[in-house]
From Swiss-Prot:
Family statement: Belongs to the KaiB family.
PANTHER family xref list: CIRCADIAN CLOCK PROTEIN KAIB2, KAIB-LIKE PROTEIN 1
Organism, as annotated: Gloeothece citriformis (strain PCC 7424) (Cyanothece sp. (strain PCC 7424))
Domain description: Has 2 forms, fold switches to a thioredoxin-like fold (KaiB(fs)) when bound to KaiC.
Function (record text): Key component of the KaiABC oscillator complex, which constitutes the main circadian regulator in cyanobacteria. Complex composition changes during the circadian cycle to control KaiC phosphorylation. KaiA stimulates KaiC autophosphorylation, while KaiB sequesters KaiA, leading to KaiC autodephosphorylation. Phospho-Ser-431 KaiC accumulation triggers binding of KaiB to form the KaiB(6):KaiC(6) complex, leading to changes in output regulators CikA and SasA. KaiB switches to a thioredoxin-like fold (KaiB(fs)) when bound to KaiC. A metamorphic protein which reversibly switches between an inactive tetrameric fold and a rare, thioredoxin-like monomeric fold (KaiB(fs)). KaiB(fs) binds phospho-KaiC, KaiA and CikA. KaiA and CikA compete for binding to KaiB(fs), and KaiB(fs) and SasA compete for binding to KaiC, thus the clock oscillator and output signal pathway are tightly coupled.
Gene3D superfamilies (alphabetical): Glutaredoxin
Record-level GO BP terms: circadian rhythm
NCBIfam families (UniProt xref): circ_KaiB, PRK09301.1
Keyword check for Cell cycle: no
Alphabetical keyword list: Biological rhythms
Quaternary structure, from the entry: The KaiABC complex composition changes during the circadian cycle to control KaiC phosphorylation. Complexes KaiC(6), KaiA(2-4):KaiC(6), KaiB(6):KaiC(6) and KaiC(6):KaiB(6):KaiA(12) are among the most important forms, many form cooperatively. Undergoes a major conformational rearrangment; in the free state forms homotetramers as a dimer of dimers. When bound to the CI domain of KaiC switches to a monomeric thioredoxin-fold (KaiB(fs)). KaiB(fs) binds CikA, leading it to dephosphorylate phospho-RpaA.
Entry-linked Pfam families: KaiB
Protein name from the UniProt record: Circadian clock oscillator protein KaiB
Amino acid sequence: MNTFRKTYVLKLYVAGNTPNSVRALKTLKTILEQEFQGVYALKVIDVLKNPQLAEEDKILATPTLAKVLPPPVRKIIGDLSDREKVLIGLDLLYDEIQDRESELDF
């Protein structure tokens, strides 16, 4: 069995401590803990406190979730409440299916 697992680096861009920001973070943490236990790094960036980071990463709306690693970079803007849409939108669901299939090949 292959014990190596990818580590996912994600950035969540929010605008302050608004209900949408809080909901997006809570939903995302639930998804990540269920699907990627311990194999992810999540950085939350408040664009009101760090507008230069939003500008550098070309963030135009919040909440925005970006998968930075592994490549390619993928972004989801807006509602993060649909687990499957989040995973598919970031190519995370496909990666996990591929990893599980390759583990079964042994």
